[in-house]
């Protein structure tokens, strides 16, 4: 399957706000969906200055990666903040440290985000004390403290 640069430029994109963080706002063009990919997600995302890509999180089972196309920002992985810019590549192996991408620059931060699409995953949001269980389309968010109480 093929999608031209002109067609991608004309795609409207979807504004996404993370359910746990109203400052996690991005515009998403799902290139993988456009060409029928089922097992790999490929997204062209744009993060406005002052926004971030998502809530600080870590996947237990899915690998994820980011390639920066334009703009500048900061990638936070665990306790480490790394300045990022065009041409930089960041990989997040499954089971790794939590991360988030912040646009602390003055222009839109545009990235290609690539990740697995497994039927199930577990995603931790340590700053919010939440865990998401995803299984075959069902999504259940719980308070991490509930796990220790059971």
Question: What is the role of each PLM region?
Answer:
Residues 36, 74, 94-121:
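Ligand-binding loop in jelly-roll beta-barrel domains
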Residues 44-48, 58-76, 114-118:
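Short, conserved beta-strand element in jelly-roll/cupin
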């Amino acid at each position: 399957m093929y999608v031209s640069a002109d067609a991608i430029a004309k795609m409207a994109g979807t504004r996404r706000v993370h359910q746990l963080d109203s400052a996690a706002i991005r515009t998403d063009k799902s290139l993988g969906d456009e060409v029928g990919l089922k097992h790999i997600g490929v997204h062209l995302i744009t993060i406005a200055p002052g926004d971030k890509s998502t809530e600080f999180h870590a996947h237990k089972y899915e690998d994820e990666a980011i390639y920066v196309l334009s703009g500048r920002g900061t990638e936070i992985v665990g306790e480490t903040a790394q300045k990022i810019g065009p041409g930089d590549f960041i990989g997040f192996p499954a089971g790794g440290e939590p991360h988030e991408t912040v646009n602390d620059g003055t222009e839109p931060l545009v990235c290609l985000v690539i990740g697995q699409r497994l039927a199930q995953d577990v995603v931790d949001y340590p700053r919010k004390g939440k865990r998401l269980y995803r299984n075959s389309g069902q999504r259940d968010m719980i308070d991490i403290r509930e796990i220790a109480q059971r």
